[in-house]
């Protein structure tokens, strides 16, 4: 057996071992300590005494503290992250399992104060602090609740925000309008973290935006008081109508956390079923890592299962293999049949996409849809059930293409020219869902390699032109949901190659860039600093996932194995058992500078895909 085949065999065996009885893979979707701290704060605020969970979460948070008292979002983040440290500090104190006078807490407090105190917190953290009585709400939030009433024709309306922006914004608007806060007799005192006064100031230019919107609503629709009440009801109903079967609001941690506080502000009791179900849903996001509980931001079972199932088949596992069949059955049961918010921007499309998690029934996305379609592709020909799922998935996917030719994540044509004017740091990430290189590239790769759509089709040509028009000067592409330029370049190159452009100057330039940044050990590695600095930052170490992405891109674009490919393949084969900080380094991001993801599955998926493509194209 060749070394490449042996490497693939080892990865396949590891994946087979980790498959769940229902056919899914449930590798952790690890997102730092923020959700763990918020879960403690939520349980303590609601006076739900799940001590075993709270103690476990506190232990996990403490295990991640740096020697200087701070918490980091990723290994090479300089010094630490003030916002994460504040969240950890608050969660630990509220847990009751560590005292303020503990040396570790003193070090954390010192770090927070040296980096701006409570005032330095990001907007979501400030909302959490205000909701739990630790910070004062601003006199007026930059976006008035009346935005809920503005018609789609208005230049600034609720549905111009991304879906993940809306689901967080609806409860925030209620909370800020009510200026709600809830403390308990055990609430920690964080006043010593204030460097000035606990006042959330909104700049004058944003207050004028607030007034403009409020006046616009009144002019369009009528009397202020009646509108106010109607807007509050609409925000409340927006939440309640989008609760998933597990009790979560759109299956996200943050939106569910905020919904609980918003409902409390509207007079719901802590014992209401909707509150209890929401908390139970958040608890179900638990995933144990190294013996300690972690509350995931979301469950990634559809993403994991579809990617792994595709990788197995690329590596030679038959579509009739029990592992593949079970996984496909799992995916088929979770194809969407309901209309969600996406239908507002695509009124002629019908349901047929897939979402990120197994409980997601309303919010499909382009990435999970192409991933699931790849997984079932080899089962379609002789099975009418799979053929129907395939046809519905394709039509939904095609309907999501933006007018600019690119693909967004969740909804088409939600470009919002107002986003730069909102006083929310990284608002373009939180509230925007523009086309991205990773979504567009992967969709092109799927259409080119898995369907009969010709390269001359306008849908393909427009996507290709979008990628050509959005390439960076150095030859790379920026990836929205991964780290970052290697990720975007991999998706773009493989997509363009599948569309017949492997010899295009843009693709050659991208491959030259990848070759230039290869490390001496044959691998590749990119820092999470890239996304906040808007340019490639090397990690100064190689990772399995980065290396797999880079190799896979070059393989797609060349006819013969190059020296760079050979060195990269050798790095992968020598590093499959690697266990160090690079293994746990985040490869995904959702909010630049604030929110990073360690997908535990990636170390298996992408090396297996790269090895399979290498073996299939070049042999040994």
What do these predicted regions represent?
Residues 1-620:
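Preference for long, amphipathic alpha-helical scaffolds in soluble/luminal domains
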């Amino acid at each position: 057996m060749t070394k490449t085949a042996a490497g693939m065999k080892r990865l396949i065996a590891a994946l087979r071992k980790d498959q769940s009885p229902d056919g899914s893979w449930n590798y952790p979707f690890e997102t730092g300590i923020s959700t763990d701290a918020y879960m403690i704060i939520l349980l303590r605020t609601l006076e739900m005494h799940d001590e075993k969970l709270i103690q476990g979460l506190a232990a996990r948070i403490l295990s991640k503290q740096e020697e200087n008292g701070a918490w980091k979002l990723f290994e090479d983040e300089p010094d630490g992250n003030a916002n994460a440290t504040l969240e950890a500090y608050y969660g630990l104190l509220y847990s009751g399992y560590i005292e303020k006078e503990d040396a570790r807490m003193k070090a954390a407090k010192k770090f927070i104060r040296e980096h701006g105190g409570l005032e330095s917190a990001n907007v979501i953290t400030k909302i959490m602090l205000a909701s739990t009585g630790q910070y004062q709400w601003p006199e007026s939030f930059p976006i008035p609740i009346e935005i809920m009433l503005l018609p789609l024709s208005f230049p600034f309306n609720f549905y111009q925000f991304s879906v993940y922006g809306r689901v967080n914004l609806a409860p925030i608007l209620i909370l800020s309008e009510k200026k709600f806060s809830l403390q308990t007799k055990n609430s920690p005192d964080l006043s010593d973290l204030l460097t000035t006064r606990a006042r959330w100031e909104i700049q004058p230019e944003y207050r004028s935006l607030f007034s403009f919107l409020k006046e616009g609503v009144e002019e369009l629709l009528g009397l202020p008081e009646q509108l106010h009440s109607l807007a509050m009801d609409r925000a409340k109903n927006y939440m309640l109508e989008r609760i998933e079967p597990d009790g979560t609001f759109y299956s996200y941690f943050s939106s569910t956390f905020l919904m609980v506080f918003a409902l409390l502000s509207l007079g719901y009791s802590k014992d209401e079923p909707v509150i209890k179900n929401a908390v139970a849903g958040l608890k179900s996001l638990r995933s144990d890592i190294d013996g300690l509980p972690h509350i995931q931001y979301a469950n990634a079972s559809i993403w994991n299962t579809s990617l792994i199932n595709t990788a197995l088949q690329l590596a030679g596992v038959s579509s009739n293999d029990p592992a593949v069949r079970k996984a496909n059955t799992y995916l088929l049961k979770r194809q969407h049949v309901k209309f969600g918010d996406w239908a507002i921007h695509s009124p002629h499309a019908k349901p047929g996409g897939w979402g990120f998690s197994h409980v997601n029934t309303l919010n499909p996305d382009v990435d999970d849809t192409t991933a699931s379609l790849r997984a079932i592709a080899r089962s379609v020909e002789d099975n009418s059930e799979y053929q129907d799922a395939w046809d519905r998935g394709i039509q939904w996917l095609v309907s999501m293409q933006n007018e600019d030719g690119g693909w967004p994540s969740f909804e088409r044509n939600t470009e919002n020219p107002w986003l730069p004017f909102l006083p929310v740091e990284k608002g373009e990430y939180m509230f925007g869902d523009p086309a991205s290189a990773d979504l567009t590239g992967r969709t092109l790769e799927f259409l080119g390699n898995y369907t009969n759509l010709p390269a001359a089709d306008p849908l393909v040509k427009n996507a290709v032109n979008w990628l050509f028009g959005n390439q960076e000067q150095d030859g790379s592409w920026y990836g929205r949901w991964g780290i970052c330029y290697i990720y975007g370049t991999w998706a773009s190159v493989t997509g363009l190659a599948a569309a017949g452009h492997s010899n295009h100057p843009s693709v050659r330039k991208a491959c030259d860039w990848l070759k230039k940044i290869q490390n001496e050990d044959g691998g590749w590695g990119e820092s999470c600093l890239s996304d906040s600095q808007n340019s490639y930052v090397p990690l100064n170490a190689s990772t399995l996932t980065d290396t797999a992405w880079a190799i896979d891109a070059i393989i797609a674009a060349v006819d013969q194995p190059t020296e760079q490919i050979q060195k990269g393949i050798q790095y992968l084969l020598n590093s499959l058992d690697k266990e160090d900080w690079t293994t746990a380094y985040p490869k995904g991001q959702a909010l630049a500078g604030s929110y990073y993801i360690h997908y535990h599955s990636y170390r298996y998926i992408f090396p297996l895909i790269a090895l399979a493509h290498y073996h299939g194209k070049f042999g040994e």
